[in-house]
Every structure is written in structure tokens, then in C-alpha cells.
């Protein structure tokens, strides 16, 4: 690739650093394009010097564009095609937030593997996934694309996702670097303000997991860090990403984010933005063309920029080589990929991604006479946001899988036939957010369950029938007032193509729910942001001291904490033990716990191991998830589950941003059990 680089003119090099949509080559391919892409100010010559394409609908379209491009390419450097395969291509997996509920990286790997096959078969070589932004504010619309509020879970699942893509040859781009999930007030594109210590301690872990898994690209975020937009932030892109995280791949702007630095008022114009971008370490420009239009003149004044440009172009060429495009620019081998197993993978992942939050009478027997009410009784569009080629027309509605005596998809009580409802034994109310109420640019100020639903639940009380609510949502919602009106509560964050079958199978007990919440459900909106791994404070809450951490009008406690989730099985945890109570870094303890299924129902459960550093040189969380394992238990079976502690489980960043381990006491938590050990030098 270095020899090829030497042959390129400056204009050709800058073309390799520019991404445009396919309609620039084939006019008929102009689909769902908006904003900056519609006016990139490129002439005919420039169009055929660009190096990458944003979005493609099929492998045939890819071939069509590639053929036209290569016919006019001086060096026969193929285009590379990228797009957003977030949770599946044609077969839609659960959303990332739903996947995180499974606490099963093996299934998530398989889901990414299946998605990769379908994406490659559709003409893509790169997916803009995973979104590894740590999230703590459910008002933000993009929490549905995340793996939740825990840094360690984010690390593990980001890594599993990338490895799944990689196993099939699909390249991945982790996003959004960095700390995009901390947008103030939960508003998309808003300001982010955090310290370097906070960045290193919590917010980098997801990106680190993706990079450790082999991510090929990193996308910058729309926000600022230390008052400098991430897209032109040299500290983030060169010091943190390249030096600290050892990333060697391609960096890319988010959609038009380079030119958006003008709106941040940190760049004077296109050319100032281009100069700052290349200096900061931004390789590839998406949806704008300031590199191509501005840098030739800028280089005349500062030839040292040529070195930075060459480094960026070489990385892009190596990316194309990695994708196999130089050997076969049409990647014909991808057409024959076997995707017949995708639906089974989606079902298995969705089964473990549904969460049971309240249970008084589930599962139901098949002979139970059911009234199935609510819009999701017959809704086919249950795929969730970012569902790419997923077709809701071929998706089953819930009424197909639940044997209901009475079905009404209205959400108006007056539309119901109470005589028919009263002839049934149980009400299933399938309600919640629509797919378009979460995702990019879909933030909410109010995440309470709709008052309309509360009134509906209150009126349904007059039937005296047990009520199961199935909540379809893209975020945690406030369910405090609704909970007393509900007998059983199943929640999922959009389960994809097999949603209806999984919901029905769970209600009937064919599937025993084993999901756990990857995000905390607040009791009240005023608690936001609320997350389990909060720092200890100087005045922790005390019932006997009024001058401590509390609200006057609501409890400090969430409605449902991170990691909460019920099962039809009854699991008991006992005999939490350590192999040693005094340890050194060379001989850290093994933690063991006995888990017993005390019920007559086989089930799976995730054992979550938390650690608290009892004393440290900087404030530390009240507890942190450090390891987890998922096991299956037959009725009345017991298993001893072991965790070997590592140095990383005990480490943290100090004020100098050095990762250290300090001697002292550590507390281990598993469910309601605790134990302690001391680390000595």
C-alpha cells in the first residue's frame, strides 16, 4: 500500500479521505438523503476520486456503483461501502440495550456473526457498530443503541460484538468517541462536560472493549470534550485514542460533524475545520468535502501537513486491503453466504433479552382464556429503531402467537367489550413506546408511562381480572404509579424479528425469562441521572440525621436497579467463600458461591459479582460489577460457581490518570451475600 500511496496526487489522496452517498454515481440510488449530503460541492472529477460510500441497499447496487467508479479510476482503487447495521440487516436481532439484558456475550457474538453475514451479502464491508457510549440518562434517545450504564458490561459486550462481526470478515466502526452518552439533560447533540479522570475511569471502557476486540474504525462524537469538539480534538484522537488505547485503525467523523464545528464556533469556516480535523487526527470525512476542497490550498502554506495526510490515506488503503477489495472489488464470495440460521439466532438471543420485573401469576397455561388488548396486540412493526432492511410486513403480530379469546388493539377503554373481557381469565395489555420514539434525535423530557395508560389500567381494575403488562420500550420509563395496578410486568427494549413469538413463549412458560436490567429504572424523573455505581458521599443517607443525602418528596432508591430481573425458577445463593482472606497481587482469591434452583422449573440465571474498594486515594463507587457468569440449573440442582479475581478487578485510575491497585480492604457482593478480603503488598 505504501507504493500505491506514492503514486497518488494530493487530490487523489484527499479523495480517499472523503465519503459520499451512492447517488453521486447512480442517480437512481438517491434514497433517504438529507442535510449536508445533498450539497457537497463536488465536481465530476472529484466524485470519481472519492474513496468510500455511505450506504447501499444491495450487493447488486454495490456492484453497479463499483463498476462505474472503477471504469474511471486512474489507479483502480476500489470504493469501500459502509452503513449502519446496528442490530441486524434483514433478520433483526434485539436492540443493543435489549441484548445487554441477556448478560450473555456468547449469544451477542452469534447475533453479530449472523448480522455480519447478511450485511456482507447486502454489499457492505463496514458497519458503524457497536455504539459503546456509556449511558446514565434514559431521556437520551440513543440509550436503545447502547449496552447500558455499566462500564464493565459495556466493555465485554462491545468486545463480543466486534469479534462476532470480525469472524465473518465484516469490518466494524465503534462509536461515538468520546462520552457522547453524557449529553446534558439527555438531549441528543448537546454539551458534554466531564473530567479526564471521569473519562478514563468509566467512559472509555466500552471503546476499549471494541478496540481490544479488533475494531477497525472509530467514529468521533458530535459533542465537545474540554470545550473542543471531539472531531477536531487532538487530545482525544491522538493522545487518548492512539497513545492510550493503542488504536491503529481509521478514524471517521460522524455525519457532517467536521463542518458542525463551525456551529460550535470553534472553526471559522470549512477550511479552518479541515485544517483542525487533519491536525487533530481525523482520517475520513463523512457527508462533507472540506478536505477535498480546502486542503490543497492549505498544504501550499504548510507542507508538513502532507505527512499527516499520507498517514491517514495509508490507513484507509490498508482498511480496503483488509476488506479484500483489492483482490475482488465486487466481493462475489459474499453473495453465497449462508444466512439460513439467522432467525434461530435472533430467537435465542431475544429469549434471554426479555426481563420479568413483577410476577404474581405467570406463566399462564395454554387453556387460560385471554383478553389481548393494546396496540401491540396486532402491531407488526416491532423491530425497534435502526432496523435497516428489516421488513415489518413479514413480522408476526402478538395475536398470532397468543391464543386469545378476545382481541382489541384499541387503547381506549370505551372501545372494549366488557362482556367479552369478563368471560376471560386474564388480561394481557401490550403497550409502550413506538419504534420512532427512541434512537437518534429522539430524546424525551418526560419518560413517565403515558397518563393515558395509567387511566386505562385504572379502568381495567373494575374487571377484577389479573393484568399482565408487556411493555415495549426503547428506554427505562417511570412506572411507579402503574406498578400497583399490574399483577405481572414483562419489559423489553425491542426484541427484533422474533418479538411476538418470544413474548408469547414467555407468557406461556415455554421460555423462562432470565434477562436482567442493563439500566436503572428511576422511581421519579427528578432522580435522573440515577445509576447503581454511584460514588460514596460525605453525608450518606441516614434516617436519624436530616442533613444527609436525600429528597424531601421521594426515596433515594430506584424503582428497579441495574441487574434486577425475575425468573419462573427460584434461585437461592449461599456459601459465598474466598480461597483466602489475605491476598497479594500474585495470589488473588478465588470467589465461590453455591447457586440452587429451589423450584420445579429449569432456568438460567446470571451471577453478578460486584466489588467495593473499602478505602482508596480517590472516591470510588459504592459497588462495581467486575465479573459475571450465566448458568443453567435443572429443578433442585445446585452448582458451585467460581470467579478468579484479577488485578484489573481491583484497579482504578488515580488523579494522575495512572491505573493503580492500592492495598487495603475489598468487599465482595453476590446477590444478598457479602464477604471481605484484605490485599497486602
Predicted regions located by residue number:
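Glycoside hydrolase catalytic-domain context in secreted enzymes
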Residues: 1-652, 662-676, 681
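Short proline/glycine-enriched turn/loop segments at secondary-structure junctions
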Residues: 656-658
